[in-house]
């Protein structure tokens, strides 16, 4: 029996900054979508971004996690993969060239996400005149629409400041955000 699967699911619009012809940045909509590792087109898009973003190990880690979900080694209910894309329609045919960033996380309990990996397309990080800006913040804003609590372990250095700027607070080695400003409860990461 052949299993029928559908492609990425649109979750919400997200606001990014897009470079205008006059070299200023204007607010623009992007789409935040949940990828489906069981869908071959979604997997191809994830495979391609890990190739295009070859020096960014998080893109490879996200793709490898999707492979494990696809092979039923990990639960698709627990392990989630989302992308931010400039694509606005036809999410059953994800255009990997329009992916602005990707995030993979674990739903540890209802409305609680632990972010394992968040990667913005490197061409929008390392270049001062990039076509798109605010991609990482748009990903976090979108996750905040769908989860009441979010936790992660940041890299040392500037990523900690990035998460603080986006409303996260430091709790030991972790960063935590809560919609209701709750204190984090210890959650088993297994």
Language-model features: where?
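Non-catalytic substrate-recognition and accessory regions of acyl/acetyltransferase enzymes
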Residues: 2-130, 138-190
